[in-house]
């Protein structure tokens, strides 16, 4: 594959083939961005009819933590690029696939190994790169966990080393919270059951996601780091419920945020978009986490930027020029399923889209749960505050209902 020079025709011998591992709502938008550039896309997920399956050229259902199954699907499809969109993947198998020359892993196989769990990336950030982080400790038994809580102090945040969307995450405020927090973390981890990170609580003013792109500079043909405007967000129990762009912040804090994002993404290497999560208090900034892929809080860029985070990711991995410039203030607000049922319907769509500057993304997930993210409302505005009000109003207008 000639990076940045040539794209083929899908479903033909000249096709540029990309395989996504994980086909949720973020993967779906990446697939759409790739298909607009004439890329042949294969979507893989652990359950059928995932959002990305519905728009890909081909779809597969496998256990992506099974190295043999992962290797087999790669050998059958022969993609040029493999794009992980979730953490629960047999990353050692990806490293072997890349080493064998079967495909290029985005951003790199090493990056997927380091970021697949919170331990790898925290040790890289704090111990190798010397980035400011909250105090932390790891534990793989309840006894070690209790000792870690005592060492870090209360309040502290407890997370499985491997989970997503806030699953298994809680705050320990008193001794009575210790055992429930351990049990909740054990239930919420996707893989590597039994290991958690205990983090000291950072008294921050706000959280941001610094969307950071490593892409080819067309002028020099070297890899260059680009930054989107900071994305502010609100999380509840570790799960994003609202985001907006740009987040107002001091010039000093913005510079520190970008320095941290540059250091950690440069250490991970490769091409693509990274979501770097940071805590900010005044001019001080702490590193929290990084995902080597589009970030859920970055859904706002579908409305705020000329090239969304998904288009930036698609262009970057293909070696094409990127433009992360902000177009307008915008916001996003999550639409939850509200009920446990397959094949739900949504009412109030007309009212939601009647909100000035509003748009919707209904993800098409086949099964709803009360707190499952089933869609998102987007809105633009003259200011961030206006955009946030509009997005929340549009989201509130959408009513998930039983299709029975």
Curated annotation (Swiss-Prot):
ATP binds at residues 118, 159, 164-169, 199-202, 207. Its EC number is 6.3.1.21. It catalyses: N(1)-(5-phospho-beta-D-ribosyl)glycinamide + formate + ATP = N(2)-formyl-N(1)-(5-phospho-beta-D-ribosyl)glycinamide + ADP + phosphate + H(+). Pfam families: ATP-grasp, PurT_C, RS_preATP-grasp-like. InterPro entries: ATP-grasp, ATP-grasp_carboxylate-amine, ATP_grasp_subdomain_1, PreATP-grasp_dom_sf, PurT, PurT/PurK_preATP-grasp, PurT_C, Rudment_hybrid_motif. One of its GO terms (molecular function) is ATP binding. It comes from the Bacteria. Pathway: Purine metabolism; IMP biosynthesis via de novo pathway; N(2)-formyl-N(1)-(5-phospho-D-ribosyl)glycinamide from N(1)-(5-phospho-D-ribosyl)glycinamide (formate route): step 1/1. It is an enzyme of class 6 (ligase). GO terms for cellular component: cytosol. N(1)-(5-phospho-beta-D-ribosyl)glycinamide binds at residues 25-26, 85, 296, 365, 372-373. Keywords: ATP-binding, Ligase, Magnesium, Metal-binding, Nucleotide-binding, Purine biosynthesis. Residues 123-318 form the ATP-grasp domain. Homodimer. Belongs to the PurK/PurT family. This is Formate-dependent phosphoribosylglycinamide formyltransferase.
């Amino acid at each position: 594959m000639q990076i940045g020079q040539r794209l083929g025709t899908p479903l033909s011998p000249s096709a540029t083939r990309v395989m996504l591992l994980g086909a949720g709502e973020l993967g779906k938008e990446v697939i759409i961005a790739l298909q607009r550039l004439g890329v042949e896309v294969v979507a893989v997920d652990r359950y059928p009819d995932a959002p990305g399956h519905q728009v890909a050229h081909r779809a597969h259902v496998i256990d992506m933590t099974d190295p043999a199954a992962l290797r087999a699907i790669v050998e059958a499809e022969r993609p040029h690029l493999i794009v992980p969109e979730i953490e629960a993947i047999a990353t050692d198998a990806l490293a072997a696939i890349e080493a064998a020359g079967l495909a290029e892993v985005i951003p790199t196989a090493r990056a997927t190994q380091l970021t697949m769990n919170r331990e790898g990336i925290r040790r890289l950030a704090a111990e190798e790169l010397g980035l400011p982080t909250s105090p932390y400790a790891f534990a793989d038994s309840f006894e070690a966990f209790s000792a870690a809580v005592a060492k870090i102090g209360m309040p502290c945040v407890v997370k499985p080393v491997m989970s997503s969307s806030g699953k298994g995450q809680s705050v320990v405020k008193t001794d009575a919270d210790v055992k429930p927090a351990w049990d909740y973390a054990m239930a919420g981890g996707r893989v590597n059951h039994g290991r958690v990170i205990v983090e000291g609580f950072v008294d921050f003013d706000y959280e941001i996601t610094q969307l950071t792109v490593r892409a080819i500079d067309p002028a020099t043909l070297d890899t260059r780091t680009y930054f989107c405007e900071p994305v502010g967000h609100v999380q509840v129990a570790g799960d994003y419920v609202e985001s907006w762009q740009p987040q107002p912040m001091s010039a000093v804090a913005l510079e520190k945020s970008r320095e941290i994002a540059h250091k950690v993404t440069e250490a991970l290497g490769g091409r693509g978009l990274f979501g770097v999560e940071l805590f900010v208090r005044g001019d001080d900034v702490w590193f929290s986490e990084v995902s080597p892929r589009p970030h859920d809080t970055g859904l706002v860029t579908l409305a705020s930027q000329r090239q969304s985070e998904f288009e930036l990711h698609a262009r970057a991995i293909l070696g094409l020029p990127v433009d992360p410039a902000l177009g307008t203030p915008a916001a996003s607000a999550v639409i939850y399923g509200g009920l446990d049922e397959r094949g739900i319907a949504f009412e109030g769509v007309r009212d939601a889209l009647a909100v000035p500057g509003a748009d919707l993304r209904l993800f098409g997930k086949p099964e709803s749960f009360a707190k499952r993210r089933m869609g998102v409302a987007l809105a633009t505005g003259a200011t961030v505050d206006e955009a946030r009000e509009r997005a929340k109003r549009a989201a509130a207008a959408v009513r998930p209902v039983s299709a029975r």
